[in-house]
Amino acid sequence: MTKIFAHRGSKGTHPENTLASFKEAVSVGSDGIELDVHLTKDGQLVVIHDETVDRTTNGTGEIRNLTLAEIKALDAGSWFYNTYAGEKIPTLEEVLLLLKELGFNGQLNIELKTDIIQYEGLVEKCLALQGTQTWPFAIVYSSFNPYTLVELKKLNPTQEIGLLFESVEWANKGDAMLEKEAYHPDLKLLDWTLEWNTNQLPLRVWTVNEDKDMNRCFELQIEAIFTDYPEKALQLKENYER
C-alpha cells in the first residue's frame, strides 16, 4: 500500500523542517519523513528548504554565508504561529538523533539541495554522518541535480537514491545518467511519468495535499506520496486498507 511521507515534517500544521514538525510526523504514524539539507559557512549540515533563511526565520541571508552559531540564533517557528516561537533550524544530526529517540523505523528521505548552489563536501558529510552508527530507519537520498546523485553512488554504490524532477527534460536527463532505482516526480507530471516509467520503477510523488489527488495515488497503488498533511493522508488511506 502507498507509503505516506511527511513533507518537511508535518509542514501543513507545524513550522517546516523543525524538530516540532518531525515529532508530529512520527506521532501521527508517518511511513516516511522528508527533509532538505544545506551546508553552512562553517561546513555544518542544516535542515532547511530554501537557500536563504528569509522565508522561515526572523533573519536574512544565504545559508552558505552564515555560520551554524548565527543560524542557531534565529527563530524558525514564529513565522508559522507564535506557539512555535523559539523553534530552531536543526542540524541533520539533531534530526537523526531525534528520530532514533522517538523510535521511528520508517524511511527518511534526505533531499540534497544542490540544484541551485553546489555545496562542496555536502554528499561526503551526509554519508559520513550516516555511517557514525546504525540507524533504526532506512535512508534514501534524493536530488533535482543528477550530478549529485552520480557523485553519491560513486562514494556509496549500494545507497538508495531517488531522482527528483519537475520537467520532462530533467527527467530524461537524469534517467540517462543514473542507475534506475526510483523516480520522485512532481504531481503535475504523474500521468506523463506513468507512461514514461516503462521499467515500472517505484514512484514517490510530490506534493500531494488534496483529497482527490491522494485518493488517485492510492487507487493507482503508487509507491509513496510526499504530503504536507500526513495525518489526513493516513486517515484517507484507511479506506483502501479495509
Predicted regions and their residues:
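Phosphate-group recognition and catalysis centered on beta-loop-alpha active-site segments
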Residues: 1-242
